[in-house]
From Swiss-Prot:
Organism: Conus planorbis (Planorbis cone)
Function description: Probable neurotoxin with unknown target. Possibly targets ion channels.
Source organism, top-level taxon: Eukaryota
Signal peptide coordinates: 1-20
Coarse class of the protein's main subcellular location: secreted
Additional information: The mature peptide does not contain cysteine residue.
Protein name: Conotoxin Pl064
Keywords: Cleavage on pair of basic residues, Ion channel impairing toxin, Neurotoxin, Secreted, Signal, Toxin
MF-aspect GO terms: ion channel regulator activity; toxin activity
Family classification: Belongs to the conotoxin NSf-1 superfamily.
Tissue and organ expression note: Expressed by the venom duct.
Length: 71
């Protein structure tokens, strides 16, 4: 029983040690859900200055405002 416990302990220490060393080597925190490059490029090129998008956003926010705060 104690051998099994020691083996599991060693495996856990090795696993945690490699995760920590990889995070230190990269200089950033380890991300659990990385975004694919294609999705990131599509998101960055999305036209945030589109007038239709702005008007729709303002209209949606206007509808969400509580009654009595509209000017």
């Amino acid at each position: 029983m104690s051998r099994l416990f020691m083996i599991l302990l060693v495996i856990c220490v090795i696993t945690l040690g490699t995760d920590a060393s990889q995070a230190e080597d990269s200089g950033t925190e380890k991300k659990s859900w990385p975004m694919p490059d294609a999705d990131l490029k599509a998101f960055q090129s999305w036209p945030l200055t589109d007038p239709d998008l702005k008007s729709a956003f303002k209209q949606y926010n206007w509808q969400r405002m509580p009654y009595g705060t509209r000017k």
